[in-house]
């Protein structure tokens, strides 16, 4: 029996997106805060790349300053390459973590973008697996939807749920200090 020859490996051009590495979860976008393997942050901003550019830029800047994660439901035009290219352009030199997590939209009952979610305990952060309709309990997180700034959303959440102040406080401090 003869071994099947392996095709030659073609190294990606410098600056090109290595889809193979991306699929293995080992891609590191330049200047993007990698969320892979890190403990989940309590603060997530659910966005769509079809939102107005000015809103996306503001939220990306605020996510970088606060340490929030940008969450996408899926791919732009069903293309990982297009999605990564748009996200790289949006993030630029800022260090921002972002994930594609369609289940998080269900887990936190997100129906529009942007939606801001602040989890109040580790159980809500660690939730994995399938859920059909809002499997995070309402007591485990607070959220707000609307085209507003991150600091406004956090302040609104604290006014509605004073118990969220301890979790929201450090994020608000980082936003106000710069």
Q: For each of these PLM feature ranges, what is it?
A:
Residues 114-128:
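A short, hydrophobic beta-strand/beta-hairpin element that forms part of a small beta-sheet core
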Residues 1-44, 48-90, 127-178:
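Non-globular targeting/processing and membrane-anchoring segments
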Residues 88, 92-113:
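Thioredoxin-like thiol-disulfide oxidoreductase module
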Residues 46, 105-108, 116, 141:
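Phenylalanine-focused residue identity feature
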Residues 76-78, 104-106, 122-124:
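Solvent-exposed loop/turn segments at secondary-structure junctions
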Residues 112, 120, 157-160:
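Alpha-helix boundary/capping residues
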Residues 41-43, 66, 94-96, 112-115:
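Envelope-exposed proteins and targeting segments
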């Amino acid at each position: 029996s003869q071994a099947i020859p392996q095709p030659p490996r073609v190294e990606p051009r410098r600056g090109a997106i290595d889809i193979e590495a991306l699929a293995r979860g080992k891609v590191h976008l330049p200047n993007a805060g990698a969320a892979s393997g890190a403990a989940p942050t309590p603060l997530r901003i659910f966005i769509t790349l079809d939102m107005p550019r000015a809103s996306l830029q503001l939220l990306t800047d605020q996510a970088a300053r606060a340490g929030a994660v940008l969450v996408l439901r899926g791919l732009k035009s069903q293309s990982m390459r297009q999605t990564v290219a748009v996200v790289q352009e949006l993030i630029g030199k800022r260090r921002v973590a972002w994930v594609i997590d369609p289940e998080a939209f269900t887990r936190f009952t997100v129906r529009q973008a942007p939606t801001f979610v602040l989890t109040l305990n580790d159980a809500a952060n660690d939730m994995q697996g399938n859920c059909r309709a809002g499997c995070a309990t309402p007591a485990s997180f607070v959220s707000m939807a609307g085209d507003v700034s991150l600091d406004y959303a956090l302040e609104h959440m604290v006014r509605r749920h004073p118990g969220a102040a301890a979790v929201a406080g450090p994020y608000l401090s980082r936003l106000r200090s710069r």
